[in-house]
Amino acid sequence: GIAVRSTLIAGFPGETEADFAAARDLVTSYRFERLGVFPYSQEEGTPAFDMPGQVPQKVAEARVAELMELQRGVMRAFHRSLVGRTLPVLVDGYDADAKRVVGRTWADAPEVDGRVLLPKGCAEPGQMVDVTITQAHDYEVEGELAAVEPAVKGKAKKQA
């Protein structure tokens, strides 16, 4: 499979309401499988520090929240499209709080994207497992094992 990922900065100096509307349209029309959105941060010593049209931090943060809410709907639809499909999943470890084995698909970067939640004790870190997706959430999916390959030693760490 393939997943398209991007990152947006909201509130860059000179960003207008029309620019922000274009960003909203991009998120809803392009439908990135994975998207990060961050507020512009005025950093001394950068070319943008003294640029005219600085956007107030509260406005930038509100724009981030709005774009991420749009992306939540995109992610929900993407995850729902995975239900019933069998996907290869790399097992990362065990989440003691969730009491679940956790892993990630080909579309998920470690520590920044959602996870695949699996039944406790079903696989070891480093194993590639075929997982049939059974439930979809905004940023995670749940699944059941379809097949297991041997673990690759030393390639994963346990998650707290």
Range-by-range predicted roles:
Residues 50-160:
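Terminal RNA-binding accessory module
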Residues 1-46, 66-77:
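Conserved C-terminal portion of the radical SAM core fold
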